[in-house]
Amino acid sequence: EQRLNSLLCLLESYLSAFPSSTNTAESPDISLFDHLKTTAAIGVCISEYLAAEQETQFKKRLFDNEKQFMDEQAFLLYSADFSGIQKFIYTVASDKALRSLRSRSFFLELAMEHYADELLSLCGVGRANLLYTGGGHCYMLLPNTTEVRAAIERWNRRFNDWLSEQFGISLFLAHGYTPCSGNELVDFPAERSPYKKMFRCVSSALAGHCLLYTSPSPRDKRQS
């Protein structure tokens, strides 16, 4: 796994400025690195998905029945987002405030990187499946299997338990995911805007998880 991550770093260093397509009729807006990284992410998701279903007839499933497989929800689009960032960062004493702001921002970035790395490992995939991370937010493409969904819930619960022990209720990591197919990832059919709907579903799942965190419990309501 460490060697794969090192290879990914090397590819990013040397191939980020090269276009994935050399066809002059096409717009060179995607780097060769991004193309390779995304292809690897999709490939490992398909591999894990088929392994979970104990599929052995890969050619038949993926090529002979390509149209059918493209409609299968073999992937999970996953997202996680820190809730309470503004309050956590800016609730500082005026003395040495700038240093405190920087350290807290750095902590959040480090915490998200740790969360993402651990989750990717638990799901049996690598950094290629991390689509984006930054600003206390991340997106991942994961295999849609029972084991992966269980790992997602366990790790998020464990991570939030640790946040609660360290910071009380001031910081929480909301998360959400939605199953998606190959056709949805390539926005087909375009007239139905499946790509937009896919991200809308993830955002709704995130908001729902965050709402559970911010809503008072029955016990809190009785005490108030």
Language-model-detected regions and their locations in the chain:
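Regulatory and interdomain segments flanking nucleotide-handling catalytic cores
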Residues: 1-219, 224
